Amino acid sequence: MDVNAKRGVKHVTAEWQMPQILDSLAKALNGTGPALRFAEQSNPSLESVPENIAVVVATSGSAGKAKQIGLSAAALFSSARASNDYLGAAPGDTWSLLLPLTHIAGVNVLVRSLELGREPIDLRNTTLETIPTADFTAIVPTQLHRAVNESGFLLRHLQSAHRVLVGGAMLSGELRKSATDAQLQVTATYGMTETSGGCVYDGIPLEGTEVEIREGRIAIKSTCLASYYLPTRPGETITPITDSDGWYLTNDLGHFDDGRLVVVGRIDDVIISGGEKISLRAVEEFLTPLVDGEVVAFTHPDAEWGERLAIATTASIEVDHWQELQSKIRISLGRHAIPQDIYRIAEIPRGALGKVDREKVLRTIKSKESR
């Protein structure tokens, strides 16, 4: 692909209504209009993109580094068709939109809807008193947690759907059971902007997607892979997403269990403290069921340990209870996995799709300590 052949870019703003968004997206996908950029902030320096790029999605990424990802119409259509086929969606079926369009998961709902010939039911900021029904929808675990614990409008809407896709962050077994108990038909998805969103459903790669494990890391080859990382500022260059063989090596760790992909964390979730490897996610998953609140594990620099393990929690943990928890961690995860500091915070900071923002957790705690 000639990256020097260009097409213009139009930034989608919050003022755009659904008919305008769908019309512009259709033209971007069929090549009769400019590419569309979905992002929370505009980027005047991005005036054009390679001619095969139909959509640009800006994301901070899990590590907090700003990225602009260019996706082709072929990749987006491949993703939409594979998803609709997996779900058994047919022309005339409807999707509801409960996710922001500044994220690939929201954009995917639009492309799937275009494929089915129906405008999605836009429920992002709904004030409707009646409960609209949709055949399919997509949400993040935070929304699912609120639905099954608070009931109300969202739960009833999800119960009306044939299938609810849940992605953007890890879906715990406990939350999945709660969803099943609430009569929700849930499918856990795995993917990222680089893969046009979810490309693995309930551990099984969608049509056109291959998954390998390379030294513990998840590698993906797919017809739905994005094309390029685009410049975020002047002077940066366009970088291909894949290697020369068409594989995208993620920063996620995983393995296969009975033919299904199991995601166990991220490379940056594993830290070294005192020479010992510690999985932050393992610490979180172990402690969360044992306390009355949420738990996030994180680290901060330490002269002695290199990285000092700590947790922040919304729970109130008494001294005796903490000593009991330390003993349980020692037995199950090892002495090195015992957090050396514990902080109580009112709320766990999360991104727009519900992912825990560890850097913001640390900033919040530092801010409290400096007062």
Kindly give the residue locations of the regions a language model identified.
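AMP-binding/adenylate-forming catalytic domain of the ANL superfamily
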Residues: L333-K355
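Conserved AMP-binding A3 loop
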Residues: N52-R81, G88-A90
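Conserved ATP/PPi-binding loop(s) of AMP-dependent carboxylate-activating enzymes
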Residues: P205, R214-G246, R266, E276-I278
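Active-site glycine-centered loops adjacent to acidic/histidine catalytic or metal-binding residues
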Residues: S62, G168, G191, D252, ...
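Conserved pre-ATP/AMP-binding loop-to-beta segment of ANL
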Residues: M18, Q41-A58, A90-T94
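AMP-binding/adenylate-forming
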Residues: L29, P34, A73-S79, T94-R146
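AMP-binding/adenylate-forming catalytic core of the ANL superfamily
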Residues: S222, N251-A337
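Gly/Ser/Thr-rich phosphate-binding loop
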Residues: N149-D202, E212
